[in-house]
């Protein structure tokens, strides 16, 4: 993905988010109205100047730019950035951590699992995560 280099977000992380969000379906629409590969909400897409959320390159560009913003906001903490991608940055700020929503907690674990699987393919370490041992 071009956006990987442009926004300095690991390619495998982008792929993991897409897998968790839409299972690689560019026409995906969630029950809450999120659209496209990275499941951008209409207001988020508008704020990111994404005109067509169903256009894969444009959706990925916007989604990765948003993910970079969240990583910066939460000082590179991947867990918090992913939680915010799913539940919204205000929820993460309000709870001062991953919100107690089962959907969000499951989402973070799913993305991290996919990220680990994709990273193993090229033996890439996962920056911004904490040891769970």
Model-identified regions with their sequence ranges:
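Catalytic glycan-binding domains that act on GlcNAc-containing polysaccharides
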Residues: 1-133
């Amino acid at each position: 993905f071009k956006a990987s280099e442009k926004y300095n977000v690991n390619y495998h992380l982008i792929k993991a988010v897409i897998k968790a969000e839409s299972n690689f379906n560019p026409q995906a629409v969630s029950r809450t109205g999120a659209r496209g590969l990275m499941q951008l909400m209409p207001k988020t897409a508008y704020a990111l100047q994404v005109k067509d959320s169903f256009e894969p390159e444009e959706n990925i560009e916007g989604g990765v730019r948003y993910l970079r913003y969240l990583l910066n906001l939460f000082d590179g903490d991947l867990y918090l950035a992913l939680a915010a991608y799913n539940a919204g940055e205000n929820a993460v700020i309000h709870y001062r951590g991953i919100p107690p929503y089962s959907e969000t907690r499951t989402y973070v674990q799913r993305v991290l699992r996919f990220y680990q699987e994709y990273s193993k393919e090229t033996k890439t370490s996962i920056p911004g995560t904490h040891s769970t041992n």
